[in-house]
């Protein structure tokens, strides 16, 4: 870390256990310059400290620092600042393409006559391999062993590549597969709350901050660590020393009071919070939690709430440091000095939260009485669509009506070679999965207790349910076994299948053949119930159309019940050994029972499991790789290919030119997610990506997933807009990645149409509705759009990360003016679009767009340029953020 010039003289010293640390004091800044800044939200105090520490008169000036102090007056700001996170967190689906980009940049800089070593992370980078394990085997004692072996075999090339990166790049560590989910590893081990490092022989203390290449990076906000998800390309730039450009955000205060009622889980709470904040509208804003309710909210529950910030649309969901933070650091085995430093530093900086503190100033606020939270799920296709437990059958029936299957509601269908029948609404996947819940001891112990009580009453999982348990941390296995609960989960088929994301990201694996055949043959609308954070269309499993987010104990309950057509609040879940009805309340544990099991979790468990976190098992250690400074690209690889983004890169960018007579590649409605744009799950054999892999000699059984193929642009560009549930208004009545090729009127895959347009050197645009790009921080949603030849995306609104990613790939994001939509303009996709831009373009400018219809009619409109900052404009002018960085390093 290189500190700034401290022209405001705020540098102070703090001594902890005899060790003296320098730090940039907010109290000094308040006393000397900015009265009242102690009333800033805690999250903005972290940003203010960052600016004080990195003030260099260039990227950070006293004007920037003053702008945060001035925020108190207007509670909003249009001022751009340069934020420098302490570190970067990655997972392998987004991490592999990021390392591919870094490797390609090394190749490019060597070709330009530079030194490969110039491309290396300047700040600590941790990549956790968690996205690749699939649920191939389940409900078996050897499921973990089998799935791990298959994972290593499938991903050998990718893992060899990451091993090369580990050797080639400084400041780059890889947490091997089979360790846990990146956000749990971050929460339980990597996160420090307060960081320290040396600069010119002096020791400095400062807040732990980060950006991550996964949208759920926000989970660490529960530990008082400011961080959020960014696209891989933005993370790469941050690694290479480029600050994160951002506007000082609005901060929404979320006041919590009271306490959760008996039987209510952290999952019920987070689904309620998500619904409230989506309704409020917090895209691009910070959310900060405060109020007396924090006193009774364990840190694991806070982390669950912070985790789902992407689902409620916020940049982050921040909890300030308090006594609960210290308790958690102690529980997870952090060393005593680090814990003492966290408390001393937070108190010295006015960053310590106490119920008696004066409330911070917020842009706006809302309030939730924790006692009002009810048992709930969310679905069937959006995480913000909360459903009370008692209303689930009604909501599923509404979904049946929506998809035209309501008349078959009571019909049963035979399953070949089985003695049971299936119906619409049957639960075919019940998964305890995802970073949101699987390292929260209270809900996992609750799931174990439900399993115990169910077994004692003679209940069993329904035979059509594929069940799985994939914890976010090995510590979970320790405490479930120590409590004697894992054996009951095993008896219900919730055997350990792996340590990773699994079902939540679409790695649910195949359904059993007989179940899959029945669902396909009769076009059944079946359900999954998962303890995940996302249930977008086509994400969990291609055959499962209704997906419900729920707490781990409810996941177990629905595996027993087997259908989403039953009201578990009043209908029996099954029958006991004597044939008596058993209800959910009969097997639901009390808060006291759960607390007794949670009390058994100890710091010893955490210290044991994280003692050799970077070592990996024998499979990982056996992987061999090259050790050169530049990567030896293999042209025959179907996993890792040299990307085209830096080919023929000139030292100076071309001037901006108008986009003329562009065709519309696709016309979309609202809530198009990054899963729609760039799916992560299975690859259909008949899709452009599947046909490409077949042409390279890859058997269908070895296709793996789109997520695992993100190191190969040839697969990913073919997979762009290939989600099986995406709907293009240019091809009404059809689902999947198809469009109308306007010059001939033919219907074809979006990829094939894009290639035809490219052959004829014709520009392309995408037009869509509200919330375009919601969901994962998936940079391939922008990279793929770029490779298809799309020059601009025009929508009613953008989700934060995807808008940034589009700019990072040289694509112009434009927003319709309020009241103007594709519908008011009566667009059908046959129009030609011209966009007037030049080097005079400015952030937030109004950009003229000309619409030329097929009948010759011409309409002119103005759109808002969603390039929001001067830095973003530079990235766009350079054709992308990495091109900008490479030119800067090479000059």
UniProtKB/Swiss-Prot annotation:
It is an enzyme of class 4 (lyase). It catalyses: citrate = D-threo-isocitrate; (2S,3R)-3-hydroxybutane-1,2,3-tricarboxylate = 2-methyl-cis-aconitate + H2O. The keyword Transferase does not apply. [4Fe-4S] cluster binds at residues 435, 501, 504. GO terms for molecular function: 2-methylisocitrate dehydratase activity; 4 iron, 4 sulfur cluster binding; aconitate hydratase activity; metal ion binding; mRNA 3'-UTR binding; mRNA binding. InterPro entries: AcnA_IRP_Swivel, Acnase/IPM_dHydase_lsu_aba_1/3, Acoase/IPM_deHydtase_lsu_aba, Aconitase/3IPM_dehydase_swvl, Aconitase/IRP2, Aconitase_4Fe-4S_BS, Aconitase_4Fe-4S_dom, AconitaseA/IPMdHydase_ssu_swvl. The keyword Lyase applies. Its cofactor is [4Fe-4S] cluster. Binds 1 [4Fe-4S] cluster per subunit. Pathway: Carbohydrate metabolism; tricarboxylic acid cycle; isocitrate from oxaloacetate: step 2/2; Organic acid metabolism; propanoate degradation. PROSITE patterns: ACONITASE_1, ACONITASE_2. One of its GO terms (biological process) is propionate metabolic process, methylcitrate cycle. Its EC number is 4.2.1.3, 4.2.1.99. PANTHER family: ACONITASE/IRON-RESPONSIVE ELEMENT FAMILY MEMBER. Involved in the catabolism of short chain fatty acids (SCFA) via the tricarboxylic acid (TCA)(acetyl degradation route) and probably the 2-methylcitrate cycle I (propionate degradation route). Catalyzes the reversible isomerization of citrate to isocitrate via cis-aconitate. The apo form of AcnA functions as a RNA-binding regulatory protein. Could catalyze the hydration of 2-methyl-cis-aconitate to yield (2R,3S)-2-methylisocitrate. Belongs to the aconitase/IPM isomerase family. This is Aconitate hydratase A. It comes from Legionella pneumophila subsp. pneumophila (strain Philadelphia 1 / ATCC 33152 / DSM 7513). The lineage of its organism: Bacteria, Pseudomonadati, Pseudomonadota, Gammaproteobacteria, Legionellales. The gene is acn.
């Amino acid at each position: 870390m290189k500190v700034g010039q401290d022209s405001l003289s705020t540098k102070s010293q703090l001594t902890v256990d005899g060790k003296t640390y320098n730090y940039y004091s907010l109290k000094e800044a308040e006393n000397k310059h900015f009265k009242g800044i102690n009333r800033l939200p805690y999250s903005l105090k972290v940003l203010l400290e960052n600016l004080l520490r990195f003030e260099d008169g260039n990227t950070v000036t006293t004007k920037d620092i003053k702008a945060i102090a001035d925020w108190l007056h207007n509670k909003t700001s249009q001022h751009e600042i340069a934020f420098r996170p302490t570190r970067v967190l990655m997972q392998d689906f987004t991490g592999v393409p990021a390392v591919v980009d870094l490797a390609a940049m090394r190749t490019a800089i060597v070709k330009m006559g530079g030194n490969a070593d110039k491309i290396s992370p300047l700040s600590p980078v941790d990549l956790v391999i968690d996205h690749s394990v699939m649920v191939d085997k389940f409900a078996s004692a050897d499921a973990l062993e089998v799935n791990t072996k298959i994972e290593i075999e499938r991903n050998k090339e990718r893992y060899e590549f990451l091993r090369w990166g580990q050797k080639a790049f400084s400041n780059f560590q890889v947490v091997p597969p089979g360790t846990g989910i990146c956000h749990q590893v971050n929460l339980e081990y990597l996160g420090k709350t307060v960081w320290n490092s040396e600069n010119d022989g002096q020791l400095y203390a400062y807040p732990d901050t980060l950006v991550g290449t996964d949208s759920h990076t926000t989970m660490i906000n529960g530990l008082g660590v400011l961080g959020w998800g960014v696209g891989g390309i933005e993370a790469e730039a941050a690694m290479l020393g480029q600050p994160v450009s951002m506007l000082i955000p609005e901060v929404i205060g979320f006041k919590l009071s009271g306490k959760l009622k008996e039987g209510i889980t952290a999952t019920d709470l987070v689904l309620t919070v998500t619904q409230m904040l989506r309704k409020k509208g917090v895209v691009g804003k910070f959310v900060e939690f405060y109020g007396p309710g924090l006193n009774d909210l364990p840190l694991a529950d806070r982390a669950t709430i912070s985790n789902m910030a992407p689902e409620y649309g916020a940049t982050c969901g921040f909890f300030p440091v308090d006594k609960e933070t210290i308790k958690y650091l102690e529980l997870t085995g952090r060393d005593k000095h680090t814990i003492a430093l966290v408390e001393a530093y937070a108190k010295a900086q006015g960053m310590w939260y106490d119920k008696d503190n004066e409330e911070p100033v917020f842009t706006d606020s809302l309030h939730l009485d924790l006692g009002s939270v009810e048992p709930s799920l969310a679905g069937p296709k959006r995480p913000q669509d909360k459903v009370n437990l008692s209303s689930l059958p009604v909501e599923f029936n509404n979904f049946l009506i929506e998809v035209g299957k309501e008349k078959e509601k009571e019909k049963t269908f035979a399953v070949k070679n089985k003695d049971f029948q299936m119906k619409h609404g049957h639960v075919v996947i019940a998964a305890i999965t995802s970073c949101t819940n699987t390292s929260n001891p209270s809900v996992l112990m609750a799931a174990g207790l439900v399993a115990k009580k169910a077994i004692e009453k003679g209940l069993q999982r329904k035979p059509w349910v594929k069940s799985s348990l994939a914890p976010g941390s090995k510590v979970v296995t320790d405490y479930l076994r120590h409590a004697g609960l894992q054996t009951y989960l095993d008896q219900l088929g919730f055997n350990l299948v792996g340590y990773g994301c699994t079902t939540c990201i679409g790695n649910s694996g195949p359904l059993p053949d007989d179940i899959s055949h029945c669902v396909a043959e009769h076009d059944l609308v079946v359900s999954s119930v998962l303890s995940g954070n996302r249930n977008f269309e086509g994400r969990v499993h291609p055959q499962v159309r209704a997906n419900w987010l729920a707490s781990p104990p409810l996941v177990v309950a629905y595996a027993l019940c087997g259908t989403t057509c039953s009201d578990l609040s009043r209908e029996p879940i099954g029958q006991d050994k004597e044939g008596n009805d058993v209800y959910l309340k009969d097997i639901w544990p009390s808060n006291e029972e759960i607390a007794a099991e949670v009390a058994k979790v100890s710091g010893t468990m955490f210290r044991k499991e994280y003692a050799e976190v970077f070592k990996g098992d024998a499979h990982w250690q056996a992987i061999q790789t090259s050790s050169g400074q530049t990567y030896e690209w293999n042209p025959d690889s179907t996993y890792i290919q040299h990307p085209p983004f830096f080919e023929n890169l000139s030292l100076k960018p071309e001037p901006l030119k108008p986009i003329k007579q562009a065709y519309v590649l696709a016309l979309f409605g609202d809530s198009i997610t990054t899963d729609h744009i760039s799916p992560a799950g299975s690859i259909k054999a008949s899709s452009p990506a599947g046909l490409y892999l077949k042409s390279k000699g890859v058997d269908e059984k070895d296709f793996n997933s789109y997520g695992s193929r993100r190191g190969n642009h040839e697969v990913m560009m073919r997979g762009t807009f290939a989600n099986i549930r995406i709907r293009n208004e240019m091809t009404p009545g059809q689902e999947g990645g198809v469009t109308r090729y306007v010059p001939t009127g033919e219907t074809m895959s979006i990829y094939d149409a894009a290639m035809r347009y490219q052959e004829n050197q014709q520009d392309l645009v995408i037009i869509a509705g509200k919330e375009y790009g919601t969901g994962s921080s998936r940079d391939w949603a922008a990279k793929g759009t770029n490779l298809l030849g799309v020059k601009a995306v025009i929508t009613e609104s953008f989700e934060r990360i995807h808008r940034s990613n589009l700019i990072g790939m040289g694509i112009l994001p434009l927003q319709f003016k309020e009241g103007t939509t594709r519908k008011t303009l009566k667009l059908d996709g046959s129009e030609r679009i011209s966009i007037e831009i030049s080097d005079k373009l400015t952030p937030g400018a109004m950009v003229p767009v000309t619409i030329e219809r097929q009948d010759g009619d011409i309409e002119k409109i103005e759109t808002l340029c969603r390039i929001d900052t001067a830095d973003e404009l530079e990235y766009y002018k350079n054709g992308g953020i990495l091109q900008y960085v490479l030119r800067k390093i090479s000059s």
